[in-house]
């Protein structure tokens, strides 16, 4: 089936024989002149390829051309049927990048972008220096503090470029940005009973008496406030908690463009110990599951960013939970704070 073609002697080269074996389908397609031109071009291309240094991954076939382990080795110049015939006989010798080379190029560009981004990122500079109130690193870090500062045990892999954590704007717990204090429910009730709001600092008036009925109508502002206060106090008995973890943020001087709620959490932001971590005191305690907290916490931050006035923790928790889990009837995973289901 194959036919021998004798090449014009003007294309002589000491390394290449005068006769090339051309498949019959190509011999029918092209004239002798075109075939000889193809041979000359392929020789040039082979020489050009041979000049390039061979990487470890590539190997050479018998003809000296590089093979990447993909497709047949380049023994003869292949012509695709459907293409329009070119001047050189339909052979396009433009160097085509292999899939691996394309992937390598993509990886390099991504790495360059990442390094450039890391260079341009600005860090939060504190004017006050190291804080006096910086607490000692706790033996058992609570779940909230592990959200705020990445744990020291988890080291990023050398080669892998990991995404920056979502909490990167939050101050480090060990730098005095936050103090985690465990207080008793009695202390928490006492704080709630104070006349000024622990977060906003605005003074709260005393609970008024319902003007409509002696028992309380349950509709007016005074009744609503009184009921919320009673529910809050009763919540400690419902959960059966022994400690409450209060998170105080140290108010530091921060540049005005950084003074956003994501950078400085409101002071007095506290959460029941159930939402934190296992107590480790021997007795198991019902607490919010970690998945729930991990899904709700970013929403809390977003809500606080949208509306900084929405700092009351209970309101925030409920709003975030409704956002994340709209199908659940009750906001709290282990039953409600109040008794109305």
Curated annotation (Swiss-Prot):
<feature type="region of interest" description="Disordered">
    <location>
        <begin position="46"/>
        <end position="175"/>
    </location>
</feature>
<comment type="similarity">
    <text>Belongs to the nepovirus protein P3 family.</text>
</comment>
<protein>
    <recommendedName>
        <fullName>Protein P3</fullName>
    </recommendedName>
</protein>
<feature type="compositionally biased region" description="Basic residues">
    <location>
        <begin position="97"/>
        <end position="116"/>
    </location>
</feature>
<feature type="compositionally biased region" description="Low complexity">
    <location>
        <begin position="142"/>
        <end position="152"/>
    </location>
</feature>
């Amino acid at each position: 089936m194959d036919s021998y073609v004798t090449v014009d002697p003007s294309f002589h080269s000491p390394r290449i024989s005068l006769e090339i074996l051309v498949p019959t389908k190509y011999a029918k397609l092209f004239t002798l002149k075109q075939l000889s031109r193809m041979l000359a071009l392929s020789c040039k291309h082979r020489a050009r390829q041979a000049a390039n240094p061979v990487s470890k991954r590539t190997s050479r076939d018998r003809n000296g051309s590089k093979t990447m382990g993909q497709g047949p080795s380049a023994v003869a110049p292949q012509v695709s049927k459907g293409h329009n015939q070119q001047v050189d006989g339909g052979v396009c010798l433009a160097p085509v990048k292999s899939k691996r080379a394309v992937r390598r190029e993509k990886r390099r560009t991504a790495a360059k972008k990442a390094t450039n981004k890391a260079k341009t990122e600005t860090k939060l500079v504190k004017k006050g220096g190291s804080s006096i109130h910086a607490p000692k690193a706790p033996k058992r870090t609570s779940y909230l503090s592990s959200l705020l500062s990445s744990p020291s045990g988890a080291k990023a892999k050398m080669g892998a470029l990991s995404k920056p954590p979502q909490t990167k704007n939050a101050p480090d717990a060990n730098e005095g940005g936050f103090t985690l204090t465990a207080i008793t429910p009695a202390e928490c009730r006492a704080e709630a009973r104070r006349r000024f709001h622990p977060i906003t600092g605005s003074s709260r008036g005393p609970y008024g008496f319902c003007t409509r009925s002696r028992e309380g109508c349950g509709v007016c502002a005074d009744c609503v406030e009184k009921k919320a206060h009673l529910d809050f106090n009763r919540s400690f008995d419902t959960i059966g908690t022994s400690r409450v973890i209060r998170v105080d943020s140290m108010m530091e001087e921060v540049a005005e463009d950084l003074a956003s709620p994501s950078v400085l959490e409101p002071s007095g932001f506290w959460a029941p110990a159930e939402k934190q971590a296992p107590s480790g005191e021997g007795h198991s305690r019902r607490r919010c599951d970690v998945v729930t907290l991990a899904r709700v916490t970013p929403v809390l931050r977003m809500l606080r960013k949208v509306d900084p006035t929405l700092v009351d923790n209970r309101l925030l928790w409920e709003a975030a939970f409704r956002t994340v889990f709209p199908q659940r009837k009750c906001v709290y995973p282990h039953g409600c704070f109040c008794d109305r289901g």
